[in-house]
Amino acid sequence: MFEFTRMDALVSERFTSNNRFVDILGHCGVSMLSEYLSKGNLEKAAVAGSGFIKQADLHDQDDVKPQNKFSAAAKLSYALQMAELIAALHDYPHGKIVHNDIQLSQFLFDQSGMLKFNDFNRAEIMLWDEQKQDYCRYRNGPGGGNNRAPEEYYDKPVNEKIDVFSFGNGVYGLLTGLWPFYELDEDHETEMQEKLKRGETPFVDPRYHNRSFEEGILVDIMNATWAYDPDDRPDMISLVTKLRLAKLEMDKHVSKHS
């Protein structure tokens, strides 16, 4: 408990100059005081229901039916904000930081509706190998839950690419309003983990790709983040670049037709 709180406070303190991170006000022992945000988190808005449903109950024969009320533009905007915040950790100038627990619930809304990043108690500040001139991979212990990358369930050495995989799961929630493997509820957690270990990825209705420009971009990004081999996944900086370019294109289209 002490180490979790210490890490949460340490990472929060390092980013006090970034107003997109929840601001730490104080820390002592196993307690941390941070700014109060009353607008809820992204998970409750993106996955408004249970997030689990049987395929037949979607009634989507004629068209896909996202289970949230986000517009395509909002989905792209939130995905970009999430990516920028994760990238800030990975690109920290004094050493790469892995969040280690990327979920939609870690992104809180401020008064203006922008996202603020939160909850760094599982963060890992990666060590640097002078001989190899690279960051050292580390072990987390066997992963729990269903938001993790395949290598975590095998307890293999991991790096920041576990955050990339979990970011893809967050994008899935934005896109569909559902959890990955939405037909398997929490009682089937082991079954979900076995699917991920085998390299299976959640079903993405192909109609999402052509539903809108924004959603097509998100499908492409999601599929890239779910590469089984972590070395084949894009880094967060390249994802931020792609999302920013997509948002510029989206804004240009809106301006042209307004």
Name each model feature, range by range.
Residues 23-71:
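Conserved structural core of kinase catalytic domains
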Residues 10-19:
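Structural motif at the C-terminus of the N-lobe alphaC helix and the adjacent alphaC-beta4 loop
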